[in-house]
């Protein structure tokens, strides 16, 4: 399955509050931070809303497991 590599290239100073929340939802905190996310329509929609703040590319790597998968693995 494909994944999306997202990088925050601009700071959040001066941007609207909803865009800050979206960037936080993508898991990006500081400028130049990078995150590997699953290739879903929801992720692409979030990226589209803050496209002026981020750079992204599709990569051939497995996205990190979700929260439920990590919890199940920790219990085993």
Curated annotation (Swiss-Prot):
Keyword Ribonucleoprotein: yes
InterPro entries for this protein: Ribo_uL30_ferredoxin-like_sf, Ribosomal_uL30_bac-type, Ribosomal_uL30_ferredoxin-like
One cellular component term from this protein's GO annotations in UniProt: large ribosomal subunit
Listed Gene3D superfamilies: Ribosomal protein L30, ferredoxin-like fold domain
UniProt GO molecular function: structural constituent of ribosome
Gene Ontology BP annotations: translation
Record-linked Pfam families: Ribosomal_L30 (PF00327)
SUPFAM superfamilies associated with the record: Ribosomal protein L30p/L7e
Domain of life where this protein originates: Bacteria
Keywords for this protein: Ribonucleoprotein, Ribosomal protein
Stored NCBIfam families: rpmD_bact
Family recorded in the similarity comment: Belongs to the universal ribosomal protein uL30 family.
Subunit structure: Part of the 50S ribosomal subunit.
Protein name: Large ribosomal subunit protein uL30
Organism from which the protein derives: Anaeromyxobacter dehalogenans (strain 2CP-C)
Gene for this chain: rpmD
